[in-house]
Amino acid sequence: MRRSIVYAVLTAAAALGGSLAAGQTLPASVPQPVDIRVHVAAGGGFVDDLSLADFDLTEDGRPQPLRSLTLIRSGQINRRQGIDVMVTPPPRTYTLLFQLTDWDPNLSKAVEYLFGSVLRAGDHMTLVTPFKPYHLQSDALSLRTKADLAKAMDETLRKDILRGSGEYRDLVAELSRLSRAISGTAGAAGSREDIESDPTDDADSGFGLETQIDRYRQSLMRMEGIRLVDEAKLLSFAASLKPVPGQKTVILFYQREFRPEINPAAMNRLMSLYQDNPQILANLMDLFQLFKRERKFDADAVKKAFADAGIDFHFIFMEKKSQRVFGATMHEQSEDVYPGFVEMARATGGTSASSTNPAAALKAAAAVSTDYYLLTYLPGAASVPGFRRVDIRLKRPGCQVLSPAGFFVR
């Protein structure tokens, strides 16, 4: 049975967060240093020769003095400057989420790169497939070869994507069949044998068309239900990762989605044929002209929660070609989640990419997550609880700066 990807993520994060101590809670009146992760790039590479004097930090528009700078390269401390600097390298936690309905062979190269160039002994890694989460044992990177681990992950990922997305693919096939029936092309060779026994499937009669439209709506709603992005679970996921110390990298692989629907020519024909039937006209317009997925989560609330938790979130939107379906048109339908995930990446100092090459997109995300400056400062006196926006500006021109949007004062 296919599980909600967000449910699986929440389960994975709870298991990870529960095994790590959050530390002592200090009185709210005592200001504590805040860590800000900053990635600086120029000319396609990381800029590693910056000092405290090169950065300006503002909190809600007010300049704040920086206390320290720590340069992190591939999880190791390369340079320190200032007071109360970091002494030991931060632990690293990676969570990889896969919301895919079809296996893409290019993912194998991404998995090879992950184990060959990113993960190292001591890292925590959780893999979340459409079926369930998996945790990499803490000593696995020390006891097994990276090639063996990459092969095991590749096989698991392939198996779970095919198994966990079976219901989704069945619904796509059902919507394709119904689109052909509604269009009046269901009688073509090879497309009607599965519905021939039902007299109400005659798309040329008003009653049959209404039945087909109703079945299409039901299947569409079932598809919506199994891929629902739940705001509450996203917020809980961020909260569960907040106490986890060190670097917290979350990478979401999301595959482009398509919905089968009747083609424009068939739509025009049906609108003409049933112009005297307002109920059928309304249903046709509702499903095939006006239907649009609305955002299922408040991107502003979720992105602030992820930034506050210290997560660097990376969104990899995997492009794929539209399938050719006789008698139907494949309509792209990722509009409800794409903008929100892009906003989350931007607000956490992460990356977003639309690509047919997941390995290249992963490489770009890994470069941002593994090489960065950790700046610390004391926040201003709290007046009212809420989100404090932190902006980082670089005095050196020609550089791209990625940093989280801020944090909550409670």
Where do the language-model regions lie?
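Positively charged n-region of N-terminal signal peptides that target proteins for export
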Residues: 1-4
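General helical structural elements
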Residues: 6-7, 41
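Bacterial N-terminal signal peptides
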Residues: 7-19
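Scaffold/interface architecture of coatomer-like assemblies
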Residues: 22-410
